[in-house]
C-alpha cells in the first residue's frame, strides 16, 4: 500500500517507484490512487454515512475532481455509489455506528471507490458475511470496480473465492520471484 518504504527491491504502482517518493509524497500518491476496504471497515462512527464516503475527497483533490466530473458533485457521487451498492438516500444522514454490518461494509466500499482510484485494496471484506450476503456484496464490488476502471487486490483466507478472480496467489507464493505486474 505504500505506507512504508520497501527494505529491498522495488514497488511500482502506475509506473511510479514508491521507494523514490518521500513519505509525504507516498501519502499523497496513496490517497490519490488507492482505495481501501479494511476488514473492520474503519468507518468513523461519529460521522454520517455521507461524510464517511466523502472522506477521501477531503484529502485528495484528484479524487474530488474525478467525483465532480463523473457525477456533478461529491455529494452526488456518494449518493450514486451508495445507491449502486444497495444503500438508499434515507441512510445518508445516519451515523455510521447505527448501521448493520452489511450496511457498514457497503459504506466502506463506497468510500474506497469514490473518485475512481485506480487500485482498490480489500482486506477480508467479506469475513463477517454469510454466503448469500457475501456473493451479493462481491458482485456489487466487481461491478463498481469495472465501472470505475479500478483494479481490485482482494485479500481473503477463503479459498472458495479464488475462482472469482483473474489471478490468485497464496501466501507461500508471495516470497518467490515473480514477473512484474503493472497495476
Language-model-detected regions and their locations in the chain:
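Helix-to-loop junction immediately C-terminal to a conserved catalytic motif
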Residues: 1
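Conserved ABC ATPase "signature" region
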Residues: 17, 66-90
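Conserved ABC ATPase signature
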Residues: 95-99, 103
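Conserved catalytic motifs of ABC-family nucleotide-binding domains
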Residues: 116
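Catalytic Walker B motif of ABC-type/P-loop ATPase nucleotide-binding domains
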Residues: 120-123
Amino acid at each position: 500500500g505504500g505506507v512504508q518504504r520497501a527494505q529491498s527491491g522495488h514497488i511500482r504502482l502506475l509506473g511510479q517507484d514508491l521507494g523514490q517518493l518521500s513519505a509525504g509524497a507516498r501519502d499523497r500518491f496513496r490517497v490519490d490512487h488507492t482505495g481501501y476496504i479494511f476488514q473492520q471497515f474503519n468507518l468513523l462512527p461519529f460521522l454520517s454515512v455521507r461524510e464517511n464516503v466523502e472522506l477521501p475527497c477531503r484529502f485528495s483533490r484528484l479524487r474530488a475532481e474525478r467525483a465532480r466530473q463523473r457525477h456533478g458533485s461529491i455529494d452526488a457521487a456518494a449518493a450514486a455509489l451508495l445507491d449502486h451498492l444497495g444503500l438508499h438516500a434515507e441512510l445518508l444522514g445516519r451515523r455510521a455506528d447505527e448501521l448493520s454490518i452489511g450496511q457498514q461494509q457497503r459504506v466502506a466500499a463506497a468510500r474506497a471507490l469514490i473518485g475512481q482510484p485506480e487500485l482498490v485494496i480489500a482486506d477480508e471484506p467479506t469475513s463477517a458475511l454469510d454466503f448469500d450476503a457475501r456473493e451479493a456484496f462481491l458482485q456489487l464490488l466487481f461491478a463498481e470496480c469495472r465501472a470505475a476502471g479500478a483494479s481490485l487486490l482482494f485479500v481473503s483466507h477463503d479459498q472458495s473465492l479464488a475462482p472469482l478472480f483473474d489471478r490468485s496467489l497464496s501466501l507461500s507464493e508471495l516470497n518467490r520471484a515473480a514477473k512484474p505486474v503493472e497495476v
